[in-house]
Amino acid sequence: KTEGESTDNKIAAAGPNAVPVDTRVVVNIPAFRMDLFQDGKLIKSYKIGIGYPEFPLPQGLRKAQSIIFNPPWTPPDSPWVATMKDVSPGELVEAGSKLNPLGPIKIPIGAPSLIHGGKPASKIGRFASHGCVGLTNAQVKDFAKLLAQASSTEVSDQAIASFLQDKTRTRVVKLHQAVPVELRYETIVVEDGKLHIFKDVYSQNTNTEENLRKVLDAQGVSFEDFSVAEKEKVLAALNAMSVHPKKVVDTKTSAKNVETKSTKNAKGENVVEIGSVTLKGYPAPVNLDTGNGTSVVAARTDKNR
């Protein structure tokens, strides 16, 4: 078992769209979003880059146990490495090198995945990595600081600045308390009173009516109680975000649905307002760091428990 892997299912949040009651990191892959909770309160949200479909982010429960400043990089024996110039599988790339893609900080969360910097803002909210959570350098510095605080780890701003100043020297800070990292794949999310349906980016066929009913049941809401108009709107949103969306044809000319090509754009989200889910669900982002130097403050904060 490598650093960051967890076999303790007792600390896994239960049910779809579960809101943590402890200190943990929650990554929802299709939403391109990472949240840091401290004692059940959402502290901050980040837009992220995710693994390409060929190198997807794994799912399940991991742990963050250390923060590594100025990490070196050992390229894996993988075809994508062969396409890089001046880099060979297994040959160490030193900290601070322009050939090192990890940026100033990495946080191991169990092989083969990391949370790390080094991504340009243009890669945030997109496929951007080979099985890792990708952040900009500014994002990862901010996240590392908050993660240390949330884990009761004593490391001052001055110490962090000192670590980062010498880009060629690697420093490892062990977290005082390991922090669970939950990697979710939820394309249907009841969030702050709205139904969010995200594109099925890894083609796992999750945008189905059956899955929708499970998500609603977890919130104490029945799909049968939706109005006809609400049902049509939600099912249309599910279809649009599915792996193989179908185009609804005028029933006067055809009684069937015909299949159309799925968009190649990884990004996608439909938001449907449903009266029966008001004040229910997962919290809206808090101070969402979009990676472009701006933060989006949540419209509601009373849900961020």
Give, region by region, the residue ranges found by the protein language model.
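N-terminal pre-domains immediately preceding structured catalytic cores
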Residues: K1-R305
